[in-house]
Amino acid sequence: MINTKKADLNKLLNPEKVIWPYKERKDKTSLAPFSMELHLTSLCNFSCYHCSYQDRRSNRSVVDGSTIKGLIDSIIDLGINGVYWSGGGEPTTIKDFTKYIDRIANSKIEQALITNGLLISDKWIPLMKKFNYIAISFQASRKETYEKITGYDVRDKLFSNIRKLNDVLDGTILGARCVINKYNYKEIVPIYNDAKELGVDYLIFIPAVDYEKRGNVELSEEEKDYLRDEVKDIESSLDDSFTNLRRITKQGGAYYKKEVNRGFPCYANQIRATAFINYDGGVWLCQPHIGNQKYCIGNINDCKFTEIWNSQRHCEVIELLDSEHEMGKCKNCRSIAYNRVLHNYILTGAGNSFHDPFL
Protein backbone atom coordinates (compact mmCIF):
# COMPACT_ATOMS: atom_id res chain seq x y z
CA MET A 1 0.00 0.00 0.00
CA ILE A 2 1.23 3.50 -0.73
CA ASN A 3 -1.12 5.45 1.50
CA THR A 4 -0.70 6.53 5.08
CA LYS A 5 -3.47 7.57 7.41
CA LYS A 6 -4.75 10.17 8.05
CA ALA A 7 -6.03 11.06 4.57
CA ASP A 8 -6.04 14.67 3.45
CA LEU A 9 -8.99 15.26 1.15
CA ASN A 10 -7.32 18.35 -0.29
CA LYS A 11 -4.61 16.09 -1.71
CA LEU A 12 -6.94 13.24 -2.70
CA LEU A 13 -9.03 15.63 -4.80
CA ASN A 14 -6.15 17.78 -6.04
CA PRO A 15 -6.25 17.78 -9.87
CA GLU A 16 -2.53 18.66 -9.95
CA LYS A 17 -1.86 14.93 -9.57
CA VAL A 18 -2.28 14.78 -13.36
CA ILE A 19 1.02 16.66 -13.82
CA TRP A 20 3.13 13.67 -12.79
CA PRO A 21 1.90 11.31 -15.55
CA TYR A 22 2.06 14.16 -18.07
CA LYS A 23 5.73 14.73 -17.22
CA GLU A 24 6.87 11.15 -16.68
CA ARG A 25 5.04 9.09 -19.29
CA LYS A 26 6.67 9.00 -22.72
CA ASP A 27 5.49 7.97 -26.19
CA LYS A 28 1.89 8.88 -25.42
CA THR A 29 0.48 7.22 -28.55
CA SER A 30 1.28 3.74 -27.22
CA LEU A 31 0.66 4.18 -23.50
CA ALA A 32 -1.53 1.90 -21.40
CA PRO A 33 -4.26 3.59 -19.35
CA PHE A 34 -2.77 5.23 -16.28
CA SER A 35 -5.77 4.00 -14.28
CA MET A 36 -8.91 2.02 -15.02
CA GLU A 37 -12.46 2.23 -13.67
CA LEU A 38 -14.48 -0.99 -13.76
CA HIS A 39 -18.29 -0.95 -13.89
CA LEU A 40 -18.63 -4.68 -14.56
CA THR A 41 -22.15 -5.31 -13.28
CA SER A 42 -25.49 -3.52 -13.51
CA LEU A 43 -26.87 -5.54 -10.58
CA CYS A 44 -27.32 -3.73 -7.28
CA ASN A 45 -28.79 -4.59 -3.89
CA PHE A 46 -30.00 -0.98 -3.58
CA SER A 47 -32.52 0.92 -5.69
CA CYS A 48 -31.39 4.51 -5.18
CA TYR A 49 -33.82 6.96 -6.75
CA HIS A 50 -31.01 9.31 -7.83
CA CYS A 51 -28.80 6.58 -9.37
CA SER A 52 -27.15 7.92 -12.53
CA TYR A 53 -27.36 4.41 -14.06
CA GLN A 54 -31.01 3.71 -13.18
CA ASP A 55 -32.31 3.38 -16.75
CA ARG A 56 -29.08 2.11 -18.28
CA ARG A 57 -28.80 -0.81 -15.86
CA SER A 58 -32.39 -1.98 -16.33
CA ASN A 59 -31.20 -4.75 -18.69
CA ARG A 60 -29.29 -6.32 -15.75
CA SER A 61 -26.09 -6.86 -17.73
CA VAL A 62 -22.98 -8.40 -16.16
CA VAL A 63 -19.61 -9.04 -17.78
CA ASP A 64 -19.11 -12.83 -17.70
CA GLY A 65 -16.37 -14.47 -15.66
CA SER A 66 -14.12 -15.54 -18.53
CA THR A 67 -14.15 -12.02 -19.96
CA ILE A 68 -13.34 -10.52 -16.56
CA LYS A 69 -10.41 -12.93 -16.22
CA GLY A 70 -9.13 -11.87 -19.63
CA LEU A 71 -9.50 -8.22 -18.69
CA ILE A 72 -7.52 -8.75 -15.49
CA ASP A 73 -4.80 -10.48 -17.52
CA SER A 74 -4.60 -7.32 -19.64
CA ILE A 75 -4.57 -5.05 -16.58
CA ILE A 76 -1.64 -6.95 -15.11
CA ASP A 77 0.25 -7.26 -18.41
CA LEU A 78 -0.11 -3.52 -19.06
CA GLY A 79 1.04 -2.59 -15.57
CA ILE A 80 -1.80 -0.15 -14.95
CA ASN A 81 -1.20 2.01 -11.88
CA GLY A 82 -4.59 1.87 -10.21
CA VAL A 83 -7.93 0.09 -10.65
CA TYR A 84 -11.24 1.43 -9.34
CA TRP A 85 -14.00 -1.12 -8.70
CA SER A 86 -16.96 1.17 -9.09
CA GLY A 87 -20.46 1.98 -10.29
CA GLY A 88 -23.05 0.84 -12.75
CA GLY A 89 -24.23 -1.63 -10.14
CA GLU A 90 -22.70 -2.77 -6.85
CA PRO A 91 -19.22 -4.30 -7.45
CA THR A 92 -19.40 -6.60 -4.42
CA THR A 93 -22.25 -8.52 -6.12
CA ILE A 94 -19.86 -9.76 -8.83
CA LYS A 95 -19.38 -13.53 -8.72
CA ASP A 96 -15.81 -14.46 -7.66
CA PHE A 97 -15.16 -10.83 -6.77
CA THR A 98 -12.73 -11.82 -4.02
CA LYS A 99 -10.62 -13.88 -6.44
CA TYR A 100 -10.27 -10.95 -8.83
CA ILE A 101 -9.21 -8.64 -6.00
CA ASP A 102 -6.61 -11.15 -4.81
CA ARG A 103 -5.17 -11.61 -8.29
CA ILE A 104 -4.68 -7.89 -8.90
CA ALA A 105 -3.37 -7.34 -5.36
CA ASN A 106 -0.71 -10.00 -5.92
CA SER A 107 0.50 -8.05 -8.96
CA LYS A 108 1.12 -4.97 -6.74
CA ILE A 109 -1.33 -2.84 -8.74
CA GLU A 110 -3.22 -0.46 -6.45
CA GLN A 111 -6.98 -0.94 -6.08
CA ALA A 112 -9.86 1.17 -4.79
CA LEU A 113 -13.44 0.14 -4.03
CA ILE A 114 -16.53 2.31 -4.30
CA THR A 115 -19.37 0.39 -2.63
CA ASN A 116 -22.63 0.78 -0.76
CA GLY A 117 -20.97 -1.30 1.95
CA LEU A 118 -23.93 -3.49 2.83
CA LEU A 119 -22.55 -6.84 1.62
CA ILE A 120 -19.23 -6.54 3.43
CA SER A 121 -19.32 -9.41 5.92
CA ASP A 122 -16.81 -10.42 8.60
CA LYS A 123 -15.17 -12.95 6.27
CA TRP A 124 -14.46 -10.16 3.78
CA ILE A 125 -12.47 -8.03 6.23
CA PRO A 126 -9.04 -9.47 5.27
CA LEU A 127 -9.87 -8.74 1.62
CA MET A 128 -10.71 -5.13 2.43
CA LYS A 129 -7.16 -4.61 3.68
CA LYS A 130 -5.91 -5.12 0.12
CA PHE A 131 -7.46 -1.88 -1.11
CA ASN A 132 -5.66 1.44 -1.23
CA TYR A 133 -8.92 3.07 -0.28
CA ILE A 134 -12.58 2.16 0.20
CA ALA A 135 -15.33 4.73 -0.34
CA ILE A 136 -18.71 3.78 1.12
CA SER A 137 -22.02 5.33 0.06
CA PHE A 138 -23.30 7.31 3.04
CA GLN A 139 -26.69 8.69 2.17
CA ALA A 140 -28.52 9.84 5.27
CA SER A 141 -28.59 10.27 9.02
CA ARG A 142 -32.15 9.08 9.65
CA LYS A 143 -33.44 5.54 9.02
CA GLU A 144 -36.50 6.86 7.23
CA THR A 145 -34.40 8.86 4.81
CA TYR A 146 -32.18 5.87 4.02
CA GLU A 147 -35.28 3.88 3.12
CA LYS A 148 -36.63 6.66 0.90
CA ILE A 149 -33.32 6.93 -0.98
CA THR A 150 -32.26 3.29 -1.31
CA GLY A 151 -35.57 1.45 -0.97
CA TYR A 152 -34.37 -0.34 2.18
CA ASP A 153 -33.92 0.31 5.90
CA VAL A 154 -30.15 -0.26 5.97
CA ARG A 155 -28.81 2.52 8.18
CA ASP A 156 -27.97 0.45 11.26
CA LYS A 157 -26.38 -2.38 9.26
CA LEU A 158 -24.28 0.06 7.26
CA PHE A 159 -23.10 1.97 10.32
CA SER A 160 -22.16 -1.34 11.95
CA ASN A 161 -20.10 -2.36 8.90
CA ILE A 162 -18.30 0.99 8.88
CA ARG A 163 -17.37 0.58 12.55
CA LYS A 164 -16.05 -2.94 11.92
CA LEU A 165 -13.93 -1.75 9.02
CA ASN A 166 -12.62 1.22 10.94
CA ASP A 167 -11.51 -1.08 13.77
CA VAL A 168 -9.32 -3.27 11.54
CA LEU A 169 -8.14 -1.18 8.58
CA ASP A 170 -4.68 0.23 9.22
CA GLY A 171 -3.20 1.22 5.86
CA THR A 172 -6.45 1.39 3.89
CA ILE A 173 -8.13 4.78 3.70
CA LEU A 174 -11.82 4.46 4.63
CA GLY A 175 -13.94 7.22 3.16
CA ALA A 176 -17.61 8.04 2.73
CA ARG A 177 -19.45 9.51 -0.27
CA CYS A 178 -22.81 11.24 0.04
CA VAL A 179 -24.91 12.10 -3.01
CA ILE A 180 -26.85 15.23 -2.08
CA ASN A 181 -30.41 14.75 -3.28
CA LYS A 182 -33.97 15.89 -2.67
CA TYR A 183 -34.43 13.51 0.26
CA ASN A 184 -31.27 14.19 2.26
CA TYR A 185 -30.30 17.82 1.61
CA LYS A 186 -31.88 18.87 4.93
CA GLU A 187 -29.73 16.28 6.77
CA ILE A 188 -26.32 17.36 5.53
CA VAL A 189 -25.14 18.65 8.91
CA PRO A 190 -26.22 15.46 10.79
CA ILE A 191 -24.59 13.38 8.01
CA TYR A 192 -21.35 15.30 8.52
CA ASN A 193 -21.53 14.75 12.29
CA ASP A 194 -22.31 11.03 11.87
CA ALA A 195 -19.31 10.55 9.59
CA LYS A 196 -17.06 12.28 12.12
CA GLU A 197 -18.43 10.11 14.93
CA LEU A 198 -17.94 6.90 12.92
CA GLY A 199 -14.29 7.83 12.36
CA VAL A 200 -14.09 7.65 8.56
CA ASP A 201 -11.06 9.36 7.03
CA TYR A 202 -13.00 11.68 4.75
CA LEU A 203 -16.51 12.56 3.58
CA ILE A 204 -17.12 13.65 -0.02
CA PHE A 205 -20.41 15.30 -0.95
CA ILE A 206 -21.54 14.92 -4.57
CA PRO A 207 -24.67 16.79 -5.69
CA ALA A 208 -26.97 14.54 -7.72
CA VAL A 209 -26.68 14.96 -11.50
CA ASP A 210 -29.50 13.93 -13.83
CA TYR A 211 -27.33 12.18 -16.43
CA GLU A 212 -30.31 10.27 -17.85
CA LYS A 213 -32.60 13.33 -18.01
CA ARG A 214 -35.33 11.70 -15.92
CA GLY A 215 -36.25 14.92 -14.13
CA ASN A 216 -36.75 15.55 -10.40
CA VAL A 217 -33.23 14.33 -9.56
CA GLU A 218 -31.14 17.47 -9.13
CA LEU A 219 -31.69 20.04 -6.39
CA SER A 220 -33.80 23.06 -7.27
CA GLU A 221 -32.36 26.54 -6.74
CA GLU A 222 -34.53 26.90 -3.64
CA GLU A 223 -33.15 23.63 -2.24
CA LYS A 224 -29.59 24.74 -3.00
CA ASP A 225 -30.26 27.96 -1.10
CA TYR A 226 -31.49 25.95 1.89
CA LEU A 227 -28.36 23.80 1.77
CA ARG A 228 -26.13 26.87 1.57
CA ASP A 229 -27.80 28.41 4.63
CA GLU A 230 -27.46 25.18 6.62
CA VAL A 231 -23.76 24.88 5.86
CA LYS A 232 -23.17 28.55 6.64
CA ASP A 233 -24.18 27.87 10.26
CA ILE A 234 -21.34 25.34 10.71
CA GLU A 235 -18.84 26.72 8.20
CA SER A 236 -16.35 27.89 10.82
CA SER A 237 -16.07 24.34 12.20
CA LEU A 238 -15.71 22.52 8.87
CA ASP A 239 -12.47 20.59 8.34
CA ASP A 240 -11.47 20.98 4.68
CA SER A 241 -9.01 18.09 4.97
CA PHE A 242 -12.00 15.90 5.90
CA THR A 243 -14.81 17.17 3.65
CA ASN A 244 -15.43 19.17 0.48
CA LEU A 245 -18.70 20.61 1.81
CA ARG A 246 -17.44 24.19 1.94
CA ARG A 247 -16.26 23.97 -1.67
CA ILE A 248 -19.58 22.50 -2.83
CA THR A 249 -21.57 25.39 -1.39
CA LYS A 250 -19.16 27.99 -2.77
CA GLN A 251 -19.63 26.44 -6.22
CA GLY A 252 -23.38 26.90 -6.06
CA GLY A 253 -24.17 23.32 -5.10
CA ALA A 254 -22.08 21.78 -7.90
CA TYR A 255 -19.34 19.15 -7.55
CA TYR A 256 -17.32 20.48 -10.47
CA LYS A 257 -16.36 24.12 -10.72
CA LYS A 258 -18.56 25.84 -13.29
CA GLU A 259 -15.85 26.91 -15.69
CA VAL A 260 -15.72 26.11 -19.39
CA ASN A 261 -12.49 25.02 -21.05
CA ARG A 262 -12.07 26.32 -24.58
CA GLY A 263 -9.24 26.57 -27.05
CA PHE A 264 -7.24 23.50 -26.05
CA PRO A 265 -7.68 19.72 -26.35
CA CYS A 266 -8.46 17.07 -23.76
CA TYR A 267 -4.94 16.46 -22.46
CA ALA A 268 -6.27 13.77 -20.10
CA ASN A 269 -7.20 11.55 -23.03
CA GLN A 270 -3.93 12.32 -24.79
CA ILE A 271 -1.95 10.97 -21.83
CA ARG A 272 -4.33 7.98 -21.60
CA ALA A 273 -5.51 8.96 -18.13
CA THR A 274 -8.39 6.53 -17.59
CA ALA A 275 -10.35 3.77 -19.30
CA PHE A 276 -13.92 3.02 -18.20
CA ILE A 277 -15.20 -0.54 -18.72
CA ASN A 278 -18.97 -0.89 -18.58
CA TYR A 279 -21.17 -3.88 -17.66
CA ASP A 280 -22.05 -4.39 -21.35
CA GLY A 281 -18.33 -4.77 -22.10
CA GLY A 282 -18.03 -1.35 -23.74
CA VAL A 283 -14.89 0.75 -23.27
CA TRP A 284 -15.19 4.52 -22.86
CA LEU A 285 -12.79 7.39 -22.20
CA CYS A 286 -15.21 9.69 -20.33
CA GLN A 287 -17.68 8.72 -17.60
CA PRO A 288 -20.50 11.07 -18.75
CA HIS A 289 -20.49 9.33 -22.16
CA ILE A 290 -20.81 5.76 -20.87
CA GLY A 291 -23.61 4.07 -22.80
CA ASN A 292 -23.36 6.41 -25.80
CA GLN A 293 -22.03 4.36 -28.73
CA LYS A 294 -20.81 7.52 -30.45
CA TYR A 295 -17.95 7.58 -27.94
CA CYS A 296 -17.39 3.84 -27.41
CA ILE A 297 -13.93 2.65 -28.54
CA GLY A 298 -14.65 -1.09 -28.49
CA ASN A 299 -16.07 -3.98 -26.49
CA ILE A 300 -14.17 -6.57 -24.44
CA ASN A 301 -16.82 -9.16 -25.31
CA ASP A 302 -15.61 -8.96 -28.92
CA CYS A 303 -11.84 -8.70 -28.49
CA LYS A 304 -9.13 -8.25 -25.90
CA PHE A 305 -8.75 -4.90 -24.19
CA THR A 306 -5.19 -4.67 -25.52
CA GLU A 307 -6.59 -4.81 -29.08
CA ILE A 308 -9.05 -1.98 -28.34
CA TRP A 309 -6.69 0.38 -26.58
CA ASN A 310 -4.65 2.61 -28.93
CA SER A 311 -6.61 1.19 -31.89
CA GLN A 312 -7.70 3.33 -34.83
CA ARG A 313 -11.15 3.66 -33.25
CA HIS A 314 -9.58 4.82 -29.99
CA CYS A 315 -7.65 7.53 -31.83
CA GLU A 316 -10.79 8.61 -33.71
CA VAL A 317 -12.72 9.08 -30.46
CA ILE A 318 -9.83 11.04 -28.95
CA GLU A 319 -9.99 13.40 -31.95
CA LEU A 320 -13.75 13.76 -31.49
CA LEU A 321 -13.40 14.52 -27.78
CA ASP A 322 -10.53 16.94 -28.42
CA SER A 323 -12.76 18.85 -30.81
CA GLU A 324 -15.65 18.97 -28.33
CA HIS A 325 -13.36 20.05 -25.50
CA GLU A 326 -11.85 22.82 -27.62
CA MET A 327 -15.37 24.12 -28.27
CA GLY A 328 -16.25 24.08 -24.56
CA LYS A 329 -18.87 21.32 -24.83
CA CYS A 330 -17.56 19.07 -22.04
CA LYS A 331 -19.23 19.02 -18.60
CA ASN A 332 -19.59 16.94 -15.42
CA CYS A 333 -16.23 15.26 -15.96
CA ARG A 334 -13.17 15.19 -13.69
CA SER A 335 -10.91 15.52 -16.74
CA ILE A 336 -12.03 19.15 -17.13
CA ALA A 337 -10.07 20.05 -13.98
CA TYR A 338 -7.11 17.93 -15.13
CA ASN A 339 -7.08 19.69 -18.48
CA ARG A 340 -7.18 23.12 -16.88
CA VAL A 341 -4.21 22.20 -14.68
CA LEU A 342 -2.22 20.80 -17.60
CA HIS A 343 -2.94 23.76 -19.84
CA ASN A 344 -1.66 26.11 -17.16
CA TYR A 345 1.36 23.87 -16.57
CA ILE A 346 2.21 23.85 -20.30
CA LEU A 347 1.96 27.64 -20.46
CA THR A 348 3.64 28.57 -17.18
CA GLY A 349 5.27 25.49 -15.65
CA ALA A 350 3.22 26.08 -12.50
CA GLY A 351 1.80 23.22 -10.47
CA ASN A 352 2.72 20.61 -7.87
CA SER A 353 3.73 17.26 -9.39
CA PHE A 354 3.07 14.21 -7.21
CA HIS A 355 2.27 10.55 -7.84
CA ASP A 356 -1.22 9.19 -7.23
CA PRO A 357 -2.17 5.84 -8.83
CA PHE A 358 -5.74 6.96 -9.45
CA LEU A 359 -6.80 9.57 -12.01
Residue ranges: model-predicted function:
Residues 1-2, 7-10, 39, 63, ...:
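Radical SAM enzyme [4Fe-4S]-AdoMet core and its adjacent flexible, acidic
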Residues 2-133, 144, 148, 152, ...:
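Conserved alpha-helical substructure of the radical SAM core
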Residues 43, 47, 265, 329:
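The −1 position to Zn-ligating cysteines in a subset of zinc-ribbon hairpins
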Residues 88-89, 246, 332:
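Short, solvent-exposed turn/loop segments enriched in Gly/Ser/Thr/Pro and often Arg
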Residues 84, 175-176, 317-318:
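Short, hydrophobic secondary-structure boundary micro-motifs
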Residues 1-32, 54, 258, 282-283, ...:
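Flexible mid-to-C-terminal extensions adjoining Fe-S/redox cofactors in radical SAM and related proteins
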Residues 55, 87, 138, 207, ...:
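Residues that line or immediately flank small-molecule/substrate-binding pockets and catalytic motifs
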